[in-house]
Amino acid sequence: MSRRKYNVRLLRVAEDDFTEIVSYIAADRPSAAEAFATKIEKNLQLLSRSPRLGRVPKEEELARLHYRYLVVENYLIFYTIEGQTIYVHRILHGARDYLSLF
């Protein structure tokens, strides 16, 4: 029995996050940037099959808005689930003060 697959949509700001991260890494290590991009894409595919895989944030403000996040290396993919669609809101380095960016 196959699971129902969810659609994954990156919001514009998440697309910008992704592009900035990959460009930053590529400036010094192009092969590492390519590997990172592939890892993000694979994790998004995984989310499409298991949307509740990510954790609920400990920050009450984000949890109350039904955000979840998935850790990929040092980065956090923040997303929400609405019906059969996963909306990726941000892709941020875990050391950032990410709460101020929502």
Outline where the language-model segments fall:
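Arg/Lys-rich, positively charged N-terminal/basic patches that mediate binding to nucleic acids
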Residues: 1-39
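Conserved protein kinase catalytic domain
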Residues: 22, 41-44, 89-92
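Generic structural signal for secondary-structure transition and capping sites
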Residues: 30, 45, 49-53, 75, ...
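Amphipathic, hydrophobic secondary-structure cores in small proteins
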Residues: 32-37, 41-43, 47-50, 61, ...
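Basic/aromatic recognition patch in beta-strand/loop cores that engages polyanionic ligands
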Residues: 54-83
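Enriched for short, Lys/Arg-rich terminal
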Residues: 72-102
